[in-house]
A protein has these predicted regions:
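A short glycine/serine-rich beta->alpha loop
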Residues: 1, 32-42, 72-81, 134-139
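Alpha/beta catalytic cores of group-transfer enzymes, especially the acyltransferase/condensing modules
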Residues: 65-112, 184, 197-198, 203
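Beta-strand segments within the central parallel beta-sheet cores of soluble alpha/beta enzyme folds
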Residues: 26-31, 65-76, 146, 166
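DPxDG-like acidic metal-binding loop motif
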Residues: 41-64, 88-90
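Glycine-rich, charge-dense phosphate/pyrophosphate-binding loop(s)
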Residues: 155-238
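ATP-binding N-lobe of GHMP and related small-molecule kinases
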Residues: 1-39, 57, 61-63, 220, ...
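Acyltransferase
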Residues: 111-193
Length: 238
């Protein structure tokens, strides 16, 4: 079941509030959440977005929401757009907030193989945030900005060499990797197998990106090779 179903309920009702419509009660017979919780994979955001999409589908009578309104509502409930944007639009997204939430989307190259390494243990986001420094140096901030732009482009182009060189972070991974027991194995594996390694979200899941299928196993960790969804979320009937 979906541990974040409360988020789904809140987001479902929020759509009716925004559209000034009476809430149409529904009964969720079964909610299947395939995204592991508390693993840095955006499970709560997926439930929030599901609630908005379900409400929008039920209200599909000429008074439904635009994609941008769906994005705004779901992001406001989540508190940031970082997970909502790729869930809704698919592909590779870069998001920020000014007067509202903004995102830009690009498609990820199919040259890459994405391997998720999911541990059996959880890491609370609050704990992952607690280890971060309150301030960072100007040089570290500049380094992350420049490398982030290159990382975005490398994923778009399918350039493995550029991706490996662009995947240099000075703001959070050095502080968080020590919280993830076993992470040193994946870091070393990536170095030896023409891959690059990063923390998914705040952790503890680790993402390996390569241009080939990786034959990797580690006791207590679930390994999954996933494909990129470049088209985003939608409602379908089974």
């Amino acid at each position: 079941s979906c541990s974040a179903s409360l988020g789904m309920d809140v987001s479902y009702e929020k759509v009716f509030e925004v559209l000034d419509e009476p809430i149409i009660p529904i009964k969720l017979v079964e909610v299947v959440q395939k995204i592991p919780t508390s693993r840095g994979l955006g499970s709560s955001a997926s439930c929030i977005l599901a609630g908005v999409l379900i409400a929008n589908d039920i209200l599909h009578n000429g008074n439904s929401l635009s994609q941008d309104m769906i994005f705004q509502i779901a992001s406001s409930i989540e508190g940031h757009p970082d997970n909502i944007a790729p869930l809704l639009f698919g592909g590779l997204t870069c998001s920020f907030k000014n007067d509202k939430y903004y995102t830009i989307k690009s498609e990820v190259s199919n040259n890459f193989k994405f391997t998720l390494c999911i541990p059996s243990f959880e890491l609370k986001t609050s704990d992952a945030r607690r280890v971060l420094p309150k301030e960072v140096s100007m040089s570290d901030a500049v380094s992350n900005i420049s490398h982030s732009v290159a990382l975005f482009k490398a994923l778009e182009l399918g350039d493995m060499e550029l991706l490996k060189n662009a995947n240099i972070d000075k703001l959070h991974q050095d502080y968080r990797f020590p919280l993830i027991k076993g992470s040193e194995y994946f870091i070393e594996f990536a170095k030896n197998n023409n891959a690059t390694c990063m923390i998914s979200g705040a952790g503890p899941t680790i993402l390996l990106i390569s241009n080939k299928t990786l034959n990797i196993q580690y006791d207590g960790w679930e390994i999954e090779e996933l494909k990129v969804n470049n088209f985003g979320a939608y409602i379908y009937e089974e």
